[in-house]
Amino acid sequence: MIQAQTYLNVADNSGARELMCIRIVGASNPRYAHIGDVIVAVIKEAVPNMPLERSEVIRAVIVRTCKELKRDNGIIIRYDDNAAVVIDPEGNPKGTRVFGSIAGELRHLNFTKIVSLAPEVF
């Protein structure tokens, strides 16, 4: 569960390394965000000489959470970190690569470009 002031790792090569959530956009619960929810975040740590800079406000979609995700078939998924992928206003990823595994629920939420870039979808 991601809420305001939560720090997240960035799972792509957009130039940001660490984000802090400042607002949850379009989720069923406006207080907590889960996998597949879009958040507004500020970049807390960035790679030098990249398009995204520190203290820039961006949108991101959550791809991994430490909080368990229970599927309809009974499988429970839990990741080691909270991670997000930086997206543009249309929902396309800003980076060209995605690192680590992501949840398959993103495919049903129309983030198919992120799913196609991921090395492992679970």
Curated annotation (Swiss-Prot):
The keyword Signal does not apply. GO terms for cellular component: chloroplast; cytosolic large ribosomal subunit. GO terms for molecular function: large ribosomal subunit rRNA binding; structural constituent of ribosome. The keyword Cytoplasm does not apply. GO terms for biological process: translation. It comes from the Eukaryota. Gene3D superfamilies: Ribosomal protein L14. Its main location: plastid. It is found in: Plastid, Chloroplast. SMART domains: Ribosomal_L14. Keywords: Chloroplast, Plastid, Ribonucleoprotein, Ribosomal protein, RNA-binding, rRNA-binding. Belongs to the universal ribosomal protein uL14 family. NCBIfam families: rplN_bact (TIGR01067). PANTHER family: 50S/60S RIBOSOMAL PROTEIN L14/L23 (PTHR11761), LARGE RIBOSOMAL SUBUNIT PROTEIN UL14M (PTHR11761:SF3). Binds to 23S rRNA. Part of the 50S ribosomal subunit. This is Large ribosomal subunit protein uL14c.
